[in-house]
Amino acid sequence: MSTAFKMERGVKYRDAAKTSIIQVKNIDPDQELLQKPSWMKIKLPANSAKIQSIKNGMRRHGLNSVCEEASCPNLHECFNHGTATFMILGAICTRRCPFCDVAHGKPLPPDPEEPKKLAETIQDMKLKYVVITSVDRDDLPDRGAGHFAECIKEIRKINPNTQIEILVPDFRGRIEQALDKLKDNPPDVFNHNLENVPRLYRDIRPGADYQWSLKLLREFKALFPHIPTKSGLMVGLGETNEEILNVMQDLRNNGVTMLTLGQYLQPSRFHLPVARYVPPEEFDEFRTKAEVMGFEHAACGPFVRSSYHADLQASGGLVK
């Protein structure tokens, strides 16, 4: 009789180890991958000094960036631009979404010093706009919302002119408690990604619920009507354009005014495959339709991600 696999606390499980814990449908490591089209090629910067400087700053303060942990294709561009998205509450997620490259496992307890370290790092880097995200922490009673609030409070103590965008998980089953934690220290922009269409949620976001996510965005907006809410979607996972447009309309119906829409890229052979590469002209059409729907800001393009040029989008600039 075989013994059940037991995860060790604080250990990162990725790729084959991550998908072997609980088998994920539609993943075949031996599958033939779609060839990337010409518009999906990234030109790396010639000078990596700025990139290394940001990485060193993160390491010095013991912080994580989602740029590295999720293998974002824009890391070189954003780091060279002097921007990064900080990932709080550790680098181990309690969920195992098969599109995501962040490690799965049993995370360590939150670091009580992290909010101060984060504030000091932002001060050292002289950042005027920051994005803070986190892994899912279904192991915590408030799902990590209190830690977000502490980070916002500490950042504002010594960086009063820095704008703060938070990209939050769905706070599963604790929406009211989470929003109560944030009420005294709200962000400047509240971001929560729907990721894709409800028909594919069971395959793409196991443990999540489309209606929960809409409820989170709706209830935050009801509490803070003057704070912009934002959400992001990936395309190329088997959805139809009509389904994406329906999700965009759901977002508008729930008060969301900022949208990001980009191409899904498969991090490894142990992740969901790309069903198709969406051409740039279709992203242009999505942006046009988003504007007609009433989105104030819509960043749509193959390499667009939730926090890609978030400062530019928040100020009303065109991102594509």
Swiss-Prot record:
EC number(s) in its UniProt entry? 2.8.1.8
User: What EC class does the entry list?
Assistant: transferase
Q: Which Gene3D superfamilies match?
A: Aldolase class I
GO MF term list: 4 iron, 4 sulfur cluster binding; lipoate synthase activity; metal ion binding
Q: Which reaction equation describes what this protein catalyses?
A: [[Fe-S] cluster scaffold protein carrying a second [4Fe-4S](2+) cluster] + N(6)-octanoyl-L-lysyl-[protein] + 2 oxidized [2Fe-2S]-[ferredoxin] + 2 S-adenosyl-L-methionine + 4 H(+) = [[Fe-S] cluster scaffold protein] + N(6)-[(R)-dihydrolipoyl]-L-lysyl-[protein] + 4 Fe(3+) + 2 hydrogen sulfide + 2 5'-deoxyadenosine + 2 L-methionine + 2 reduced [2Fe-2S]-[ferredoxin]
Which key words tag this protein in UniProt? 4Fe-4S, Cytoplasm, Iron, Iron-sulfur, Metal-binding, S-adenosyl-L-methionine, Transferase
Cite the annotated pathway: Protein modification; protein lipoylation via endogenous pathway; protein N(6)-(lipoyl)lysine from octanoyl-[acyl-carrier-protein]: step 2/2
**For binding [4Fe-4S] cluster 1, which residues are annotated in this chain's numbering?**
C67, C72, C78, S307
Q: Which family does it belong to?
A: Belongs to the radical SAM superfamily. Lipoyl synthase family.
Instruction: Return the protein name.
Output: Lipoyl synthase
Give the gene name: lipA
